[in-house]
Amino acid sequence: MGRHSKPDPEDSVDDLSDGHAAEQQHWEDISGSYDYPGVDQPDDGPLSSEGHYSAVGGYSASGSEDYPDIPPRPDWEPTGAEPIAAAPPPLFRFGHRGPGDWQAGHRSADGRRGVSIGVIVALVAVVVMVAGVILWRFFGDALSNRSHTAAARCVGGKDTVAVIADPSIADQVKESADSYNASAGPVGDRCVAVAVTSAGSDAVINGFIGKWPTELGGQPGLWIPSSSISAARLTGAAGSQAISDSRSLVISPVLLAVRPELQQALANQNWAALPGLQTNPNSLSGLDLPAWGSLRLAMPSSGNGDAAYLAGEAVAAASAPAGAPATAGIGAVRTLMGARPKLADDSLTAAMDTLLKPGDVATAPVHAVVTTEQQLFQRGQSLSDAENTLGSWLPPGPAAVADYPTVLLSGAWLSQEQTSAASAFARYLHKPEQLAKLARAGFRVSDVKPPSSPVTSFPALPSTLSVGDDSMRATLADTMVTASAGVAATIMLDQSMPNDEGGNSRLSNVVAALENRIKAMPPSSVVGLWTFDGREGRTEVPAGPLADPVNGQPRPAALTAALGKQYSSGGGAVSFTTLRLIYQEMLANYRVGQANSVLVITAGPHTDQTLDGPGLQDFIRKSADPAKPIAVNIIDFGADPDRATWEAVAQLSGGSYQNLETSASPDLATAVNIFLS
């Protein structure tokens, strides 16, 4: 039968059903033959203006070209002999069919075929869905393109984030900053460049404590000091909130740059030996270097990173008694710092120039310089005969290491874009290609072969030195800062030491050690002398700077004369009451900017019953002023029954206690040198 003719009598119901099914399949074929975006496509995930697309301009000029056109519904004309009515009947009929309608309920009298409402609803839903997806993606792409384009054009403006690097690594950081600025994309809608300034850690820390110095530029978002000591000092000065992240970039061990003649002589020494070698007038004679006198070790702070601070940590840790914290070795650090050579300035350049100056090596003003392996490498590269003029000594034991952390800072002076740019640059510095550049400059980088050098073989390192938490590291560093101004010490000497030791009385041996130390102390040091016996304590020379005369006589000479007239007595000691008098006097005349201390040298026992051990401890506990710290250091001989009291007093005051069996040993000179530093 024709497509739109009435059913013939022989047509069955099944035939009619088959025809309707075929027509419905025809529509499904049409709608399914086009790939509509968003219908059967995999989910692309949420649209984003950042990070989802690789670059601006990755699209065609018109976003609609990314999607196929939706074809119009195909036209079809009824076939057959029946004419089309002028006004077609409604597409949908409702209610009951009359007897003239389709037989078997499939055809109406007018010959028009009805379409299932479910098919129409589904088709409309698909069209609406496709249109919605197209519009959604079109506007999303447009906004994304607009955001990327705006960012690429820096519509929010241009900005700079400051980076401060230690002078020892600043040149390499500036080189990395240039390549970073050439390739970095915008942060949000702003272009943020990195600007690197070279500055030492003291300048940066002082800037955070007080007014930020204009010569350093803007306050930084990233700081690269020589070591984590500087980060610890900043935390102590400005609070932990000042640092948001800190991690090591490269490392370089601290060592001594020396003349080759001294290198082999130091082979069996260690960090703890340096204070004694520095202060003993003939120390190097014992190392088969006659006519060299004492070691003249320079410890420059300018242009030398944190090498001096790191060496101080190593000396303190090695000098502290077994089981004691590194702070117990602070005296040794002060000794080393106090006896360093006096140069034109405190720079690494001045120290190295003096070390390498032609002439008699034995009598040279400088025998060795504390620095880092990287600085040694750089100096060696500039010498024509480096192998014969410059050597190095890396002390045995745990290595003091400059770890050059990338310290991300946090503060109100930074915008979000500056903070993000500083973080991005820090990550950039940690990339392998940037680390390789640093390795070529002499820094140690994990799994990167170091360059060849005539002055160092870049030997394998033992374990890294650890001296405690940030607070302890800051304390040790601050001690070295104050040590440069010398000490303010009062010597409290016990006259009742008649024991014969090494052919001299114990008192004579002590006097000799004190005289040698006073001769080596810097003129800025403040020194006074008290003595005591079984009856009383008395002032021999009032405390004052060594540069100031006493009764028309140079103070060192006055002190030496007073010591020379001492004689041994055998009757008791009023040590506790004498210390009380001295402590009160030092509180009243506290020397700001210097390490104030009392050095008690005694053998006991205390015999004055007006003040016992617990009473002395209670006095120290109540009198101590945190704003005026006064350390009580004790050198105690033999089996002194007052030992427990002296140990407690030293601990309460922040000082140290050392017991010696005899005065006839180098340990006495070492102890005196440590405590008067």
From Swiss-Prot:
SUPFAM superfamilies: vWA-like. Residues 17-29 have a biased composition (Basic and acidic residues). It is a multi-pass membrane protein. Residues 1-87 are annotated as: Disordered. The keyword Coiled coil does not apply. It is found in: Cell membrane. Pfam families: SBP_bac_11. Keywords: Cell membrane, Membrane, Transmembrane, Transmembrane helix. Was identified as a high-confidence drug target. This is Uncharacterized protein Rv1836c. It comes from Mycobacterium tuberculosis (strain ATCC 25618 / H37Rv). The lineage of its organism: Bacteria, Bacillati, Actinomycetota, Actinomycetes, Mycobacteriales.
